[in-house]
Regions:
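Nucleotide-activated chemistry modules centered on ATP-dependent adenylation/adenylyltransferase
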Residues: 2-281
């Protein structure tokens, strides 16, 4: 490992990839494994217990490859902290310091407390377990997602964005994962095939509770992933005064709207990614 002089003195560099197992971070890992473009010592995943099953299957599929390559893997479980923050944490008003509510409720929106929890856990791990190193952190943000860099800008690691350096877009990252056999298949009884591919119906495979999902994504979840829609309804029932998408757009109101609109036929006419990959070869 190389050495770098900085405010902490001279420490050997330790190269960590911070991943979510979405298309960006997964494609970054696949490229790093295929070609030694950058050094990689460890992969770190902060698990909030709010990921789609298909996303965790991508993790399980790649872990043996990391082991074969001698790359360490660390998973930080903050699922209990996530639920505490969602339901029980006293939330203070930033101006007055007074407690004005209990629990953050929905993650996403203007208060990205879920992201804050993940970053806090990640950097606590770096400080506690890897303080003897200068951490070089690889983050799987694509070139058309550069604004996301700001969420990672205030921490003490040396940050690298390989996909931005390589000019990889989100669409290219998804396609690259498909070409390597990673499809984010989610089981469902809503279609005859018994499965859907998350990146065909969602823009991002983020936390299934995230209120940042757009109406198209939510409609697809309602019709194609009823098991996750039930979870959204349960959370909405726990916070009835906070509509998921704002006034007049609670999960229950959106359900009525989606039923009135009807489902989109095009959702069921799509060519599954595995078949599409064969056709394009």
């Amino acid at each position: 490992m190389g050495k770098r002089k900085g405010q902490n003195g001279t420490k050997p560099e330790y190269h960590c990839a911070s991943v979510s197992w979405g298309a960006g971070s997964l494609y970054m890992l696949l490229k790093l494994l295929e070609e030694p473009l950058l050094k990689l010592n460890m992969v770190v995943f902060v698990n909030m217990g709010a990921d789609f099953t298909a996303t965790l299957k991508m993790r399980d599929k790649l872990l043996p490859e990391l082991a074969k390559s001698g790359i360490a893997y660390k998973e930080i479980d903050v699922s209990k902290e996530f639920l505490y923050d969602m339901y029980e944490r006293p939330v203070k008003n930033r101006e007055t310091g007074e407690i004005h509510r209990i629990g953050h409720s929905w993650c996403g929106g203007p208060c990205r407390w879920g992201t804050g929890l993940k970053l806090q856990a990640l950097y606590q791990f770096y400080r506690r377990e890897l303080s003897q190193y200068t951490i070089v952190e690889y983050i799987g943000i694509c070139v058309d997602e550069e604004e996301r860099q700001y969420y990672n800008a205030q921490n003490s690691t040396i940050k690298r964005y390989p996909l931005i350096e390589w000019g990889i877009t989100k669409r290219q990252a998804v396609k690259g994962c498909y070409e390597r056999g990673f499809f984010w298949e989610e089981e469902t009884d809503a279609v005859n095939t018994g499965k859907v591919y998350l990146y065909e119906i969602l823009d991002n495979c983020s936390c299934f509770w995230c209120r940042n999902k757009n109406l198209k994504e939510l409609k697809n979840i309602f019709y194609l992933l009823p098991q996750y829609w039930d979870r959204l309804k349960a959370l909405q029932a726990d916070f009835p005064d906070e509509p998921m998408k704002g006034c007049g757009k609670s999960v229950f109101e959106l359900e009525k709207r989606f039923i009135e609109e009807g489902r989109s036929v095009s959702l069921f006419d799509m060519i599954p990614p595995p078949e599409r990959m064969v056709e394009e070869m």
